[in-house]
């Protein structure tokens, strides 16, 4: 084995000693030992340095895309925001204008034209928050603004966050949304639903169906007169934003033939299941013969290359990504993760490509079947490490990329004690894995794609979102030391692929503008 990259998802390094930091509170003898023995530094994982708007926290999709590309990749969120800014005459100075102004986007306009021609409504659907991981509320506001200018009858289906934002921030986001509706005279909220239902990505189709039934058939668990009331009444039932049960609002008429839908999430993984339902691209176990109404469904970005749907911002796939370079060099590689992070070490790491490269193997370990991961904070880390170790010892791959999901997924629950347990569980498996890589003659690279468990907030106000704190980078030679190398400061995720290729003796392509982290 030549090299293995281990991604500790959500493992940030918080410089503030006055916060509840599950990473710092955890007993992590292996991580601490590797940091002391190896070549260590920190990486920046947010803002323009990973292709996001300035100050925006990073996330797993962005992180893995940058890692695999070996360069800063302008993210879809920034592409959409910059196009909106151009429509408003507010384009940022570094805007590359690769997309048309938002109000002139032909795919988005086609949804409006379809509804107008058929006497229908345009339905705007997506996560309503400023979390910036899956959506921006300003993108919805721009759609409402466009509908107002055209005089188009529009409604909004608001998915509440509480995961990348405060658990009860939805009340304010919905109030802001209703203010925009009032200002532009259209886009009233028809349903409110927590992302737990509307944005499941773990094949829990019964959750997706509950969101679908509220949007399409007006069959919600609850009814509210106004959007904000849907949130406040949910809080009174001790149910926070992420878990708000599908609620119909006002005189919602459902989704009807002749209507159009714009799904405005820019991140794909948690938008796929509901898109499958609405686009009639269904799994065999859907459990219903009922077909969705005949509508025009537009997605903000490409959610799946197999979906035959119009896309407002088509993918701008980077070429010469890590997996491709390894494949062309005749190297074998293995990608490993449990269910929650499997798309990230495959699709996103490969620059938005579903199909594996020649010589690329993939192993997925099922995530635990629990409602929330604080109930099983070790998740499937032991089984994942077992799978990786067996593969290394029996197949001897040239390269490995593995993701431990625990600090991120448990950090999102806001449960401090569970997050500490999650970090400790990962540290235990990290030790086993690094020893195996070294025994196989490989270099080990340890990093994170963003922070999360490094700031858990307070007991009364838990922090469930990602952080903008630096994340670790550690290099270990096969003998478990720095091997005479030092790690430079000021690195980003785009520098990881060039580092790995250099250690493997492979020339990096010109498109990889990142630079090696060790020398």
Curated annotation (Swiss-Prot):
GO terms for molecular function: manganese ion binding; phosphoglycerate mutase activity. Mn(2+) 1 binds at residues 408, 412, 466. Its cofactor is Mn(2+). One of its GO terms (biological process) is glucose catabolic process. InterPro entries: Alkaline_phosphatase_core_sf, BPG-indep_PGM_N, Metalloenzyme, PGAM_B_sf, Pgm_bpd_ind. The active site is at 60 (phosphoserine intermediate). Mn(2+) 2 binds at residues 9, 60, 449-450. Pathway: Carbohydrate degradation; glycolysis; pyruvate from D-glyceraldehyde 3-phosphate: step 3/5. Residues 76-91 have a biased composition (Basic and acidic residues). Keywords: Glycolysis, Isomerase, Manganese, Metal-binding. Substrate binds at residues 134, 163-164, 195, 201, 267-270, 341. Binds 2 manganese ions per subunit. Catalyzes the interconversion of 2-phosphoglycerate and 3-phosphoglycerate. This is 2,3-bisphosphoglycerate-independent phosphoglycerate mutase. It comes from Haloarcula marismortui (strain ATCC 43049 / DSM 3752 / JCM 8966 / VKM B-1809).
């Amino acid at each position: 084995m030549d090299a293995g990259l281990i991604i500790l998802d959500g493992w940030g390094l918080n410089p503030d000693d006055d916060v509840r930091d599950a990473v710092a509170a955890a007993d992590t003898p292996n991580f601490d030992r590797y940091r002391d023995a190896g070549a260590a530094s920190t990486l920046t994982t947010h803002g323009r340095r990973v292709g996001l708007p300035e100050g925006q926290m990073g996330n797993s999709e962005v992180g893995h895309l940058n890692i695999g590309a070996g360069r800063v990749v302008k993210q879809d969120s920034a592409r959409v925001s910059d196009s909106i800014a151009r429509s408003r005459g507010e384009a940022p100075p570094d805007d590359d204008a690769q997309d048309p102004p938002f109000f002139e986007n032909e795919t988005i306009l086609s949804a409006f034209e379809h509804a107008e021609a058929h006497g229908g409504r345009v339905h705007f659907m997506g996560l309503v928050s400023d979390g910036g991981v899956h959506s921006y509320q300003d993108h919805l506001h721009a759609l409402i603004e466009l509908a107002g200018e055209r005089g188009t009858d529009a409604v909004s289906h608001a998915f509440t966050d509480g995961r990348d934002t405060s658990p009860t921030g939805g009340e304010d986001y919905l109030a802001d949304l209703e203010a925009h509706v009032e200002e532009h005279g259209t886009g009233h909220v028809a349903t409110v639903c927590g992302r737990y239902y509307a944005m499941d990505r773990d094949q829990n189709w019964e959750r997706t169906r509950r969101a679908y039934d509220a949007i399409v058939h007006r069959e919600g668990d609850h009814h509210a007169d106004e959007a904000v009331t849907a949130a406040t009444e949910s809080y009174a039932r001790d149910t926070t934003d992420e878990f708000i049960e599908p609620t119909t609002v006002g005189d919602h008429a459902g989704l009807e033939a002749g209507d159009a839908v714009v799904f405005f999430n820019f991140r794909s993984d948690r938008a796929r299941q509901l898109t499958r339902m609405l686009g009639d691209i269904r799994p065999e176990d859907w459990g219903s013969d009922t077909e969705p109404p005949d509508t025009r469904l537009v997605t903000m970005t490409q959610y799946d290359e197999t979906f035959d749907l119009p896309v407002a911002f088509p993918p701008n796939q980077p070429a010469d990504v890590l997996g491709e370079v390894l494949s062309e060099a005749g190297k074998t590689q293995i990608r490993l993760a449990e269910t929650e992070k499997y798309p990230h070490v495959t699709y996103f790491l490969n620059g938005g490509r579903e199909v594996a490269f020649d010589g690329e193997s993939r192993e997925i370990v099922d995530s635990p079947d629990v409602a929330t991961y604080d109930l099983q904070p070790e998740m499937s880390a032991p089984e994942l490490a077992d799978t990786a170790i067996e593969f290394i010892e029996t197949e001897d791959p040239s390269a490995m990329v593995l993701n431990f999901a625990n600090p991120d997924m448990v950090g999102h629950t806001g449960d401090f004690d569970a997050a500490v347990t999650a970090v400790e569980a990962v540290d235990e498996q990290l030790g086993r894995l690094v020893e195996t890589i070294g025994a196989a003659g490989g270099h080990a690279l340890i990093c994170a794609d963003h922070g999360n468990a490094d700031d858990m907030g307070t007991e009364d106000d838990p922090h469930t979102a990602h952080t903008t704190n630096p994340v670790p980078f550690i290099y270990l030679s096969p003998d478990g030391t720095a091997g005479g190398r030092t790690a430079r400061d000021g690195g980003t995720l785009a520098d990881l692929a060039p580092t790995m290729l250099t250690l493997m003796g492979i020339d990096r392509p010109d498109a990889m503008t990142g630079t090696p982290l060790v020398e």
